[in-house]
Amino acid sequence: MALAVAPWGRQWEEARALGRAVRMLQRLEEQCVDPRLSVSPPSLRDLLPRTAQLLREVAHSRRAAGGGGPGGPGGSGDFLLIYLANLEAKSRQVAALLPPRGRRSANDELFRAGSRLRRQLAKLAIIFSHMHAELHALFPGGKYCGHMYQLTKAPAHTFWRESCGARCVLPWAEFESLLGTCHPVEPGCTALALRTTIDLTCSGHVSIFEFDVFTRLFQPWPTLLKNWQLLAVNHPGYMAFLTYDEVQERLQACRDKPGSYIFRPSCTRLGQWAIGYVSSDGSILQTIPANKPLSQVLLEGQKDGFYLYPDGKTHNPDLTELGQAEPQQRIHVSEEQLQLYWAMDSTFELCKICAESNKDVKIEPCGHLLCSCCLAAWQHSDSQTCPFCRCEIKGWEAVSIYQFHGQATAEDSGNSSDQEGRELELGQVPLSAPPLPPRPDLPPRKPRNAQPKVRLLKGNSPPAALGPQDPAPA
């Protein structure tokens, strides 16, 4: 009997904790009446009600499912227990900085550039932003999906699922040990710095969402910790937990030194970098580079004269060793799949949305291919999901598809290439060609004498100035 009661007791405690968290956020919101607290993102006045509403949705879904969702270690119940305890701790820290309820004006010290109180509040606002993004990613609409969460980078996803199984969160010490099996971590200060970088919510745990953000920031996977060490630990231009406004303030001292720059993880586009730099006319601009490793962006920016002096310092670290070209990536299309394309009077290379241009973009994490014009038009319509599978678009990579003559085709050799996988991100993932949407009006097919091959391109794009909202690059 006691065994049957225990789960219900935990569900009851969880429901109470969710209710307490919502009420706590409401009280905190009442302390955020000063309009200066919502000048630029991340804004506590915006984040608090959104987080409270998401927690209500989580509570409703949990009640409807009888506390459901995958349980067990590192499952939904463990995540909420850790999350709510961390939320309470961070809320108390914010409450101590804000004026009491009923008082409309906050301490001017909170808004003075460079003050200790402002730095503390800005960091806590960023942590709250991370916590809202994490909860939204693992409980979209209040329903748990952590056991099905897809990491953006295929090798990172493979590592997590093989090492952590269906868990969505685990203690730092255990995660550090698991990561060390493929990316050894030096104990001491290096391990502490790594924990500070990965643990976006400062909870002492690592969630699958936080690891996803980390692996997107410090891609590619084979040199993950080397990239992190050179870009975050050793680079004078790296700034953690900094907002748009704070970047503007920090670079004010460098306005007479064009080419000065600093970079930070974007507050509002998690998994992407934001780079602030001083232009040739002394203006301070900020940009979010489009879906390529930061080392490559900084090398290109240095070559073009944009990123020369990290944080105004004369020495610019040499990142050449991180900018080596990655091996070409191939997609082997099986004979059966090719037959499907030919039956539609199409080819693998042709974009299946417009049926006019060749595919030149790979969507992440789902891996579907289409042409850049169709992707731009699709995202311009405010759609942030893949047009084929409706998976969230977290990024994309430019690709070039061309005929590969290095081996006989499946048709010529008489051997099916069904067993050949697709090599992406220097790791193996299952064979998967994009789905074939119904298109009766496709143009005539091209000769079928070769298999396509996909290769990542490394193109340049000049920095584009941003506003404080950190919009995605065009």
From Swiss-Prot:
Please name the GO terms that the record assigns under molecular function. calcium ion binding; epidermal growth factor receptor binding; phosphotyrosine residue binding; receptor tyrosine kinase binding; SH3 domain binding; ubiquitin protein ligase activity; zinc ion binding
Q: Name one GO cellular component term.
A: membrane raft
Region annotation (SH2-like) ranges: 219-321
Q: Where is this region: Linker?
A: 322-350
What top-level class of enzyme does the UniProt entry assign? transferase
Residue intervals of the Cbl-PTB domain:
7-321
Q: Which UniProt keywords apply?
A: Calcium, Metal-binding, Phosphoprotein, Repeat, SH3-binding, Transferase, Ubl conjugation, Ubl conjugation pathway, Zinc, Zinc-finger
Record's compositionally biased regions (Pro residues): 432-441
Q: How is its activity regulated?
A: Phosphorylation at Tyr-341 is necessary and sufficient for the activation of E3 activity.
Q: Is the keyword Cell inner membrane assigned to this protein?
A: no
- Segments of this protein annotated with the region Interaction with RET: 351-474
Please list the coiled coil stretches. none
Q: What is the effect of changing residue 265 to L?
A: Enhances interaction with EGFR and SRC as well as SRC ubiquitination
Q: What is the effect of changing residue 266 to A?
A: Decreases interactions with EGFR and SRC as well as SRC ubiquitination
Q: Could you tell me which InterPro entries the record lists for this protein?
A: Adaptor_Cbl (IPR024162), Adaptor_Cbl_EF_hand-like (IPR014741), Adaptor_Cbl_N_dom_sf (IPR036537), Adaptor_Cbl_N_hlx (IPR003153), Adaptor_Cbl_SH2-like (IPR014742), Cbl_PTB (IPR024159), EF-hand-dom_pair (IPR011992), SH2_dom_sf (IPR036860)
Q: How is it modified after translation?
A: Phosphorylated on multiple tyrosine residues by SRC. Isoform 1, but not isoform 2, is phosphorylated on tyrosines by EGFR. Autoubiquitinated when phosphorylated at Tyr-341, enhanced by SRC; suggesting proteasomal degradation.
Consequence recorded when altering residue 244 to A: Abolishes interaction with EGFR. Decreases interaction with SRC and abolishes SRC ubiquitination
Q: Which CDD domains match?
A: RING-HC_Cbl-c, SH2_Cbl-b_TKB
- Mention one GO biological process in which this protein takes part, according to its record: protein ubiquitination
Query: Further remark, if any?
Result: This protein has one functional calcium-binding site.
Written domain comment of the UniProt record: EF-hand-like and Sh2-like domains are required for N-terminal inhibition of E3 activity.
Q: Which PANTHER family match?
A: CBL (PTHR23007), E3 UBIQUITIN-PROTEIN LIGASE CBL-C (PTHR23007:SF12)
Q: What is this protein called?
A: E3 ubiquitin-protein ligase CBL-C
Could you tell me which species this protein originates from?
Homo sapiens
